[in-house]
């Protein structure tokens, strides 16, 4: 009679698990659709009646256990009975009653299921060297024979024919001509008492009657010949004994599979080969109600279900997860039951599948437990071996687990939370079980109408995504209905959607793609973006065109989140479908003015608050600006961040938004300058300390410089280059340059003016002190050295500049140094102009200029050389160089200048003289051969001249002993040939100086008045042959010297010498040179 255990009710579980709906989510109407009906999971608990039947079956199995235990099994029956009592939750009194009742039941028929597999290495009894083996086997019931007695030993050597009745003897087939026969035949051998029963197997060689001629034809060796003689002595048709196997049943395990040696009856041939035997103790006619009414595999399935349920429950009670391994007690009981019921491996696997697949739907344990029975069923699947009822039960288990698995997949976000570390592996294991199940031949034959698994999973994921979205929407539903509250709720919902998509992309998509090739992320994004788009669009319409600041802030956060959501989506392609969020920025257009005004208002408040809190104290030794500059930098960075967040897609509107951002930023910069100066005045008025006022002014200038650096980075922070590329096709050429860059340059110009004004104020405080110290240099006593005279000035600058360097950033300090340097040069020029006649004062000013240059350069830390060496500096340096020189030094410089002029002159428009000059060091004689002059100017009225040449060694103070020399005068000659030689007795040392020269003055002799000047030529003595080397000079080379005139506008050196009225030598030199200049001016060509 069938019970609830044997006929599980079948239901359309797939339809309950998931409804296939093809329409898109965009067609969903609010309110959200009703959730799909949950899968009805069949309970794994049994009714009391079913439990009693199963408990009886388990007790019966333990009580009628046969054979030795397996190595890892429990040996004691009491331990197994206690385990069953705990597993079935039976009270002690009830357990004892059930135990007594089971013991009173009729014992089963004990059977030994023996399988003769094969033999190897048996004796060859035939003439051919082979045998025709067969086996006789049975069970001998021994009564009253002591173990180890002589009778027992004799009986073990006895053959089956003599010990077991013929009706209880079983025989295998005969295998012809082989020494390694294979039978694989199974026999069921009944016995009553395992303690006195033994298994006997005899192996025989079948002997058939053959003629001597036939045997001689099969003869192969001498051993075969001996076999012929031996057989001739025995009876015709008598089989040969090959060996036997005798085993006590009580020594066998419940299942045995071994090779046993074939024993001889005599010691003639001790090695007779081996026989492969399999044994299994089974029951017939079990007296339990379950065994009489239900299929064996069904009872085993229910027993397995009960024990596994107990194992899982025990682990959960101990706060540990079950690792899919059964306890030794459970393994022993299940092994005994399957063996006693003679369940095949296939039916055991099927029972395991039915039990585990049902328990998985109600208990928590690894889904990997299902893989082993799936693999076993697939490996052993033969459809014909199952009855219709079994096929239906297996098909129901497939559809039930599939429906349950799809329901878990639909709710995977809550069933497999990422807060639990093993959730991804558990989901992956479930998917692999479903994949393996749907790939089975059994599944394909029993569930032919099932849709492909990937399609079912995709639809489950799609519906699960929609259900999750509506659940989140309900979770964020505001308590108070209002546009602001609705916006906050929608923002939270969008952020949850993004978080879910991030999880899908990082974790879940990899699992679904690897197992089923399903792109979960793309599917979830497409579904969720339609749902989000409809709600956002409705919300922006409800917000209207006039957006308040609070609502505008909420809309901006929502816009930024949607922008991030769109960027999170799959990579766009040309063939992708239109998304609901495409062009979503247009929904927020009315809110743009509110966003821009909010950004400026917040920034302005921050600037005002930062200035008000600023005490104008540097932040540290390396940071010379104050707190408001840092706050301002953060404020402008926030504006740039807001602009990047906005990143408006429309190019033309994006350009206008950027213009507004730049305009507001520049306006805030100028506002800050006004506020920080006012703050400085406010604090200075309170403290009334000039030094602290200077400190604060330094901080103000530094803050402005820091602000200038921030403003200068606007093109990078607001990505002007990218904007220019985007608006290139929309704006006119140069419009961006004329607009944005004009705004930026205007702001930078305003900041530069403010900085220069502040630095100028600081410079003015120092300029007075610098001018005072420079003026004091003039009044210092003559006995004081110039280096000592400038010490007060240098100490003043060292203190002040060190202070400024400490309190100003490098850019402002450099600007201050530039202003001070310019002012210092101006003061030095004025003082130097008033002291031209005093070489002492000029010397001090010269030393001061040199030290000031070093001071302002500061070993590279101050102004660079190109900033120091201005035109004013160069001119002043030259003037002071001359003014500080003595009269003789000035004369020397004059001749150096004329020598340089002579070297640079190539034109012979005044004529030229040709000379040979050499120096004989041994005699200290300078030899001058004046050869000729040519192309002289006609200075007489007759168109000719009366030239002669005056030779002098200059300067005179270097050659005081040497008198001038003259050549003869040539009448009316413009190309005179003098050919005269002059020798000057002079030492070599003065001749080697750079300013020492031979002055050749060509004059036109005038009898009535002063001689006229034809021109001058300056020959440097340091280049004369023989002057520098010790060897006597050879033939001196000719030198052609163009004639020159003195400078027409006067020479500054002469003017300086002229100002020294009390120096007679200077006045005499100036008088001579003025005379020459006057003569030159009268006849200049």
UniProtKB/Swiss-Prot annotation:
Q: What does this protein do?
A: Plays a role in cytotoxic granule exocytosis in lymphocytes. Required for both granule maturation and granule docking and priming at the immunologic synapse. Regulates assembly of recycling and late endosomal structures, leading to the formation of an endosomal exocytic compartment that fuses with perforin-containing granules at the immunologic synapse and licences them for exocytosis. Regulates Ca(2+)-dependent secretory lysosome exocytosis in mast cells.
Q: Which family would the database say this protein is a member of?
A: Belongs to the unc-13 family.
Name of the gene this protein is made from: Unc13d
List ligand-binding residues for Ca(2+) 3: 939-940, 1004, 1006, 1012
The free-text domain remark for this protein reads: The MHD1 and MHD2 domains mediate localization on recycling endosomes and lysosome.
Originating organism: Mus musculus
Pfam families (alphabetical) = C2, MUN
In this chain the MHD1 domain maps to 554-674
The entry's note on the tissues where this protein occurs is:
Mast cells.
Topology relative to the membrane: Peripheral membrane protein
Q: A Gene Ontology molecular-function term?
A: small GTPase binding
GO cellular-component terms in the record?
A: cytosol; exocytic vesicle; late endosome; lysosome; membrane; recycling endosome; Weibel-Palade body
Its cofactor is: Ca(2+)
Segment Interaction with RAB27A: which positions? Answer: 239-542
Q: Which UniProt keywords apply?
A: Calcium, Cytoplasm, Endosome, Exocytosis, Lysosome, Membrane, Metal-binding, Phosphoprotein, Repeat
Biological processes per GO annotation: defense response to virus; establishment of localization in cell; germinal center formation; granuloma formation; natural killer cell degranulation; phagocytosis; positive regulation of regulated secretory pathway; positive regulation of substrate adhesion-dependent cell spreading
Residue intervals of the C2 domain:
91-238, 909-1034
Q: What is this protein called?
A: Protein unc-13 homolog D
Q: Subunit comment for this entry?
A: Interacts with RAB27A and DOC2A. Both RAB27A and DOC2A can simultaneously bind UNC13D. Interacts with RhoG; the interaction increases RhoG affinity to the membrane lipids, targets Unc13d to membrane lipids and facilitates cytotoxic granule (CG) docking to the plasma membrane.
Keyword ATP-binding annotated? no
Which positions bind Ca(2+) 2? 940, 946, 1004, 1006
Briefly explain the null phenotype: A truncating mutation is the cause of the jinxed phenotype (jinx), a chemically-induced mutation that make mice susceptible to murine cytomegalovirus (MCMV). It is a mouse model of human type 3 familial hemophagocytic lymphohistiocytosis. Affected mice produce a truncated protein that lack the second of the C2 domains and part of the second MHD domain. In jinx homozygotes, activated NK cells and cytotoxic T-lymphocytes (CTLs) fail to degranulate, although they retain the ability to produce cytokines.
Q: Where is this region: Disordered?
A: 24-46
């Amino acid at each position: 009679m069938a019970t609830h255990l044997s006929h599980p009710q079948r239901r359309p579980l797939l339809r309950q698990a998931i409804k296939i709906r093809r329409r898109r989510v965009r067609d969903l109407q609010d309110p959200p659709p009703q959730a799909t009906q949950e899968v009805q999971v069949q309970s794994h608990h049994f009714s009391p009646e079913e439990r009693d039947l199963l408990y009886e079956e388990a007790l019966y199995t333990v009580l009628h256990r046969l054979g030795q235990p397996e190595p890892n099994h429990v040996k004691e029956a009491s331990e197994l009975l206690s385990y069953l009592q705990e597993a079935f939750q039976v009270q002690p009194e009830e357990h004892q009653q059930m135990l007594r009742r089971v013991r009173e039941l009729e014992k089963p028929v004990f059977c030994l299921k023996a399988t003769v597999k094969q033999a190897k290495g048996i004796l060859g009894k035939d003439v051919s060297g082979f045998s025709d083996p067969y086996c006789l086997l049975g069970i001998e019931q021994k009564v009253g024979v002591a173990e180890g007695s002589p009778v027992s030993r004799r009986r073990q050597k006895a053959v089956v024919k003599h010990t077991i009745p013929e009706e209880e003897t079983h025989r295998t087939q005969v295998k012809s001509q082989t020494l390694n026969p294979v039978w694989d035949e199974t026999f069921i051998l009944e016995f009553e008492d395992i303690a006195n029963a033994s298994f006997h197997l005899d192996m025989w060689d079948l002997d058939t009657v053959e003629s001597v001629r036939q045997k001689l034809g099969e003869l192969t060796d001498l051993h075969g010949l001996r076999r012929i003689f031996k057989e001739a002595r025995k009876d015709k048709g008598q089989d040969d004994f090959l060996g036997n196997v005798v085993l006590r049943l009580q020594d066998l395990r419940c299942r045995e599979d071994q090779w046993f040696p074939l024993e001889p009856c005599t010691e003639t041939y001790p090695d007779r080969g081996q026989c492969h035997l399999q044994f299994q103790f089974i029951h017939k006619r079990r007296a339990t109600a379950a065994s009489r009414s239900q299929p064996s595999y069904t009872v085993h399935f229910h027993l397995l279900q009960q024990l596994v349920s107990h194992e899982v429950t025990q682990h959960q009670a101990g706060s540990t997860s079950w690792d899919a391994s059964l306890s030794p007690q459970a393994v022993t009981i299940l092994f005994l039951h399957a063996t006693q019921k003679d369940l095949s491996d296939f039916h055991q696997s099927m029972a395991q599948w039915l039990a585990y697949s049902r328990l998985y739907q109600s208990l928590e344990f690894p889904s990997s437990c299902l893989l082993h029975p799936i693999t076993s069923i697939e490996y052993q699947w033969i459809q014909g071996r199952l009855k219709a009822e079994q096929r239906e039960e297996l098909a129901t288990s497939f559809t039930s687990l599939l429906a349950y698995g799809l329901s878990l997949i639909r709710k995977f976000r809550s069933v497999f939370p990422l807060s639990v570390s093993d959730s991804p592996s558990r989901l992956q294991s479930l998917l692999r079980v479903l994949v393996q199940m749907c790939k089975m031949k059994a599944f394909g034959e029993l569930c032919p109408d099932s849709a492909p698994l990937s399609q079912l999973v995709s639809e489950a994921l799609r519906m699960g995504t929609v259900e999750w979205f509506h659940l989140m929407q309900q979770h964020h539903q505001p308590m108070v209905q209002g546009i602001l509250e609705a916006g906050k709720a929608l923002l939270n919902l969008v952020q949850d959607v993004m978080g879910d998509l991030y999880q899908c992309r990082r974790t879940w998509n990899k699992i679904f793609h690897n197992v089923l090739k399903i792109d979960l992320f793309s599917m979830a994004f497409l579904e969720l973006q339609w749902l989000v788009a409809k709600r956002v669009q409705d919300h922006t319409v409800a917000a209207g065109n006039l957006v308040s600041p609070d609502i505008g802030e909420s809309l901006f956060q929502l816009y930024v989140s949607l922008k991030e959501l769109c960027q999170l989506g799959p990579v766009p392609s040309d063939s992708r479908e239109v998304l609901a969020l495409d062009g979503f920025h247009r929904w927020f257009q009315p809110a743009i003015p509110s966003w821009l005004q909010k950004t400026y208002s917040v920034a302005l408040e921050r600037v005002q608050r930062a200035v008000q809190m600023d005490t104008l104290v540097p932040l540290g030794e390396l940071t010379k600006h104050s707190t408001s500059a840092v706050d301002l930098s953060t404020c402008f960075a926030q504006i740039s961040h807001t602009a990047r967040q906005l990143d408006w897609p429309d190019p033309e509107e994006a350009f206008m938004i950027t213009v507004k951002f730049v305009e507001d930023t520049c306006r805030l910069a100028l506002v800050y300058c006004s506020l920080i100066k006012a703050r400085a005045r406010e604090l200075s008025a309170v403290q009334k300390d000039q030094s602290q006022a200077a400190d604060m002014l330094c901080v103000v200038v530094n803050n402005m410089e820091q602000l200038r650096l921030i403003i200068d980075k606007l093109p990078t922070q607001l990505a002007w280059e990218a904007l220019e590329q985007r608006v290139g096709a929309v704006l006119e050429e140069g419009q961006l340059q004329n607009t944005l860059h004009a705004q930026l340059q205007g702001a930078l110009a305003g900041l530069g003016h403010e900085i220069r004004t502040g630095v100028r104020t600081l410079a003015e405080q120092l300029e007075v002190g610098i001018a005072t110290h420079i003026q004091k240099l003039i009044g210092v006593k003559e006995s004081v050295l110039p280096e000592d005279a400038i010490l007060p000035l240098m100490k003043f600058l060292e203190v002040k500049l060190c202070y400024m360097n400490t309190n100003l950033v490098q850019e402002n300090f450099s600007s201050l140094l530039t202003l001070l340097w310019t002012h210092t040069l101006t003061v030095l020029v004025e003082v130097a102009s008033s002291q031209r006649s005093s070489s002492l004062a000029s010397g001090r000013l010269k030393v001061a200029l040199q030290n000031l240059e070093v001071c302002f350069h500061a070993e590279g830390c101050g102004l660079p050389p190109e900033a120091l060496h201005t035109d004013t500096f160069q001119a002043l340096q030259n003037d002071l160089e001359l003014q500080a020189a003595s009269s003789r030094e000035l004369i020397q410089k004059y001749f150096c200048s004329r020598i340089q002029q002579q070297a640079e002159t190539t034109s012979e428009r005044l004529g030229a003289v040709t000379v040979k000059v050499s120096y004989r060091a041994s005699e200290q004689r300078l030899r001058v051969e004046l050869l000729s002059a040519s192309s002289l100017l006609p200075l007489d009225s007759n168109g000719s001249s009366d030239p002669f040449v005056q030779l002098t060694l200059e300067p005179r103070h270097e050659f005081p002993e040497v008198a001038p020399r003259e050549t003869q005068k040539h009448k009316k000659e413009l190309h005179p040939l003098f050919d005269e030689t002059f020798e000057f007795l002079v030492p070599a040392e003065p001749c080697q100086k750079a300013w020492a020269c031979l002055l050749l003055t060509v004059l036109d002799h005038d009898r009535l008045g002063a001689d006229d000047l034809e021109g001058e030529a300056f020959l440097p003595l340091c280049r004369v042959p023989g002057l520098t080397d010790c060897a006597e000079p050879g033939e001196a080379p000719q030198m052609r010297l163009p004639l020159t005139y003195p400078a027409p506008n006067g020479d500054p050196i002469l003017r300086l010498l002229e100002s020294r009225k009390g120096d007679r030598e200077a006045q005499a030199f100036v008088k001579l040179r003025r005379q020459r200049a006057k003569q030159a001016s009268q006849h200049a060509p």
